[in-house]
Amino acid sequence: MAIDEDKQKAISLAIKQIDKVFGKGALVRLGDKQVEKIDSISTGSLGLDLALGIGGVPKGRIIEIYGPESSGKTTLSLHIIAECQKNGGVCAFIDAEHALDVHYAKRLGVDTENLLVSQPDTGEQALEILETITRSGGIDLVVVDSVAALTPKAEIDGDMGDQHVGLQARLMSHALRKITGVLHKMNTTLIFINQIRMKIGMMGYGSPETTTGGNALKFYASVRIDIRRIAALKQNEQHIGNRAKVKVVKNKVAPPFREAEFDIMFGEGISKEGEIIDYGVKLDIVDKSGAWLSYQDKKLGQGRENAKALLKEDKALANEIILKIKESIGSNEEIMPLPDEPLEEME
């Protein structure tokens, strides 16, 4: 439907005035603006990258990763840092919990020599540092670990029994209002790690769980990832890792509610090789005959752990199977669910 000529002139004049005051591009017609592809940073997990719909977490957006204790939240975040650094990105880690294990981060592939780290004393200090480095335009990814540890200064300075109702929620709300536009402009990804709490006096329907820091983060986050430990991985009765399940509970850049599963091995992080085997078997790319696993004419090994060890050594073969998996699934198809149980018995 054509717009009236007088209205067109009025709108054009208004756009010129806005461009003069706020800079060119402050107000544009969507039809005149080229639609940009959403860039992403890989999570280090094949299944989660596929579940997110764009190959990883979106750049220039706020991401929330939450779950129970020891579910793999920090591990997943460190993998994202490692993937960002592999592509020349500059990353920062705001360690509000004062619990960053540098040696573990290095084992996951993080370039710790070039990782910017801050261990702030208060929530205000953490968020001021976050805003300053983001506005610099030189940062590609910032991880805040965690929202629960962003303690307001008034709470730290007060006595142990003082009540500070809603103080942290107001702090988060104020910070997110200030930082969201800057993140988009600077194309900086911000990941908040968050913890779970139980709702007080929860009765009736709905989940009794909630995340810390109020509701602002739930609204401002473009992607929210729920990660849970679902099983223990054992080899010869030795506990060697955990099986994790992730659900994309909110996604503004692709369809939400997709899920993925992967192994988190102690001291090693996410097992890409385990995902290759799981998806390969599900998609009939990897053959499973009894305990033996094979790809085309090549034997991968007897049992899942042996096959994982071979793929870990043969990177070219692993990358070849990954390519086949991505081609088989296709970028526009629903993610195929993994088997209910991994290929070897777990407790």
UniProtKB/Swiss-Prot annotation:
This is Protein RecA. It is found in: Cytoplasm. Keywords: ATP-binding, Cytoplasm, DNA damage, DNA recombination, DNA repair, DNA-binding, Nucleotide-binding, SOS response. It holds the Pfam family RecA_C. Gene3D superfamilies: P-loop containing nucleotide triphosphate hydrolases (3.40.50.300). CDD domains: RecA. One of its GO terms (molecular function) is damaged DNA binding. PROSITE patterns: RECA_1, RECA_2, RECA_3. It comes from the Bacteria. The keyword DNA damage applies. It comes from Helicobacter acinonychis (strain Sheeba). One of its GO terms (biological process) is DNA repair. One of its GO terms (cellular component) is cytosol.
